[in-house]
């Protein structure tokens, strides 16, 4: 039995080596950071299991005047894509984004027709909460899908399918409301 200690050492070394090696199937997920939770929810529906989606802000946070932390900057710097709303919703974002290098950003409100604000200090300006319109929400989904497909082409088919399913779910949810209003 003199070989038993050597066998145990060999097995232990082999097991430790196997644990430290990263197999091809354990590839890290594509990392997406959004400026707030609504976009994170939409992006998660489009990404499914193909990407890891997180929001800079937490639920209930004041999105307009948010004060990013150093941890927010660090997390965003580790992303492979940042999704923002635009339309002057995230007043803090331009300065925040200057602290990042090499992380692409896509404004998911591109192409929407925002309603105008008709009173108060923002009278005449576009309402930045454009996702609240069903038609605009579908544009957001398309923009998120296109961004994910562009920056993570290996999972393009997944993003395409998930976006199609998510849009159908949105339309199905809204169909009874449209029927009542028409």
PLM feature segments, named:
Residues 1-11:
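Bacterial N-terminal signal peptides that target proteins for export
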Residues 9-20:
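Bacterial N-terminal signal peptides
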Residues 5, 24-26:
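Short, low-complexity interaction segments enriched in Ser/Thr/Pro/Gly
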Residues 26-182:
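Extracytoplasmic metal-acquisition and chelation regions
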